[in-house]
Regions:
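Extended, well-folded catalytic/binding cores that form a central cleft or groove in large enzyme
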Residues: 1-338
């Protein structure tokens, strides 16, 4: 594992993660590497945590037991003072909720990852309409960008309002810098110029990023796609959902990835429904030219979700969250104006 920032760690070898199961049991080598990865994070953070895991999952239990045994065996390495707040290592089995990873994300950081992609804390703006010519790539790091650190978890609507406030503040400071009439004014300008220039760059960067996110949301019809996803995850309207998915799959506006995700969600949600039409939806994916690698995932995702169905069934009958979705998008019109 490597650290992206002080809150985020990722596995280096992603392909290995897909091979850790042998008939829904741990591959011994992958179990060992997973234990080593978690332990390396604990050591880097200087934490000796209490370990909790989901009771239904034998996979989570084995991982927890191996981590505990190693910590006890190497107790001298984990002799850290716990303090008043005891750290907790919580091990969850993704099978209890196969829905959430398939949903489109609507927070600032997640949308940049999903729609623009971040590599080594850098976002490429090559080909982005309206992007400044000298801004082909921007740095997006919580450690070096105060605005990003404070707003990375805001939803799409709120981030638009926040950037508008940043712009208003910048415009006020820009006006004050226009009045350089005395030696004192010149001195103040020189002293504040680095901060002013930094703020100018931050405004330009984030306005450009959010503007591009807004364009992509419209281009790929992500609002309607996300609404269909929420209905699949949280409502009991099979006919309504099936009709909406069929309509979306025959449009060219949505991405192949979003089309496939809708079918994945439908398959997980309604694979036991007497009127299910998974085969028909898969056929629509083929007709629209969806890559075979995505189509082939339908069966695998169903098998994966079914293996944890007993624990995860309650996830699929959550109360309606349409109001939450509406809240996320409520200020989109304002955001598009910045």
């Amino acid at each position: 594992m490597v650290a992206l920032d002080n809150l985020t760690f990722i596995a280096v070898n992603f392909k290995a993660l897909y091979k850790f199961l042998q008939g829904m049991e741990w591959n011994p080598n992958c179990l060992q590497r997973s234990v080593q990865g978690v332990l390396s994070v604990l050591l880097s953070l200087k934490k000796n945590p209490i370990i909790r895991y989901q009771n239904f999952s034998s996979l989570a239990r084995r991982l927890a037991e191996n981590i505990r045994d190693t910590i006890l065996k190497e107790s001298s390495l984990f002799h850290f003072h716990r303090g008043e707040s005891i750290p907790l290592l919580l091990i969850l089995d993704r099978r209890c909720d196969p829905i959430t990873p398939l949903l489109n994300q609507w927070t600032y950081q997640a949308m940049v990852h999903e729609l623009l992609s971040i590599k080594n804390n850098r976002v490429s703006l090559v080909g982005v309409p309206g992007a400044p010519k000298d801004m082909s790539e921007v740095l997006l790091s919580a450690e070096q960008d105060e605005f990003y650190a404070n707003n990375m978890y805001l939803n799409f609507g709120d981030i638009g309002q926040t950037i508008k406030s940043l712009m208003d503040e910048f415009q006020m400071k820009a006006k004050s810098h226009q009045k350089v009439e005395s030696i004192a004014d010149m001195k103040a300008f020189v002293e504040n110029y680095p901060q002013f220039k930094k703020m100018s760059g931050a405004v330009t960067k984030h306005v450009t990023l959010v503007g591009e996110l807004s364009r992509l949301v419209t281009q790929h019809n992500l609002l309607e796609v996300s609404e269909a996803e929420q209905e699949l995850a949280c409502q009991e309207e099979h006919t309504q959902s099936l009709t909406k998915i069929r309509r979306l799959l025959v449009t060219d506006q949505i991405r192949d990835l979003d089309a496939a995700r809708l079918v994945f969600l439908y398959a997980i949600r309604y694979h036991k429904h007497q009127s299910k039409d998974i085969v028909g939806l898969v056929d629509l994916l083929r007709r629209r030219g969806t890559p075979v690698r995505l189509i082939d995932c339908v069966e695998g995702i169903l098998r994966y979700a079914s293996s944890g169905e007993t624990a995860g069934s309650s996830i699929l009958t959550t109360n309606d969250v349409t109001k939450i979705t509406e809240k996320i998008f409520k200020v989109r019109a304002t955001q598009l104006m910045i």
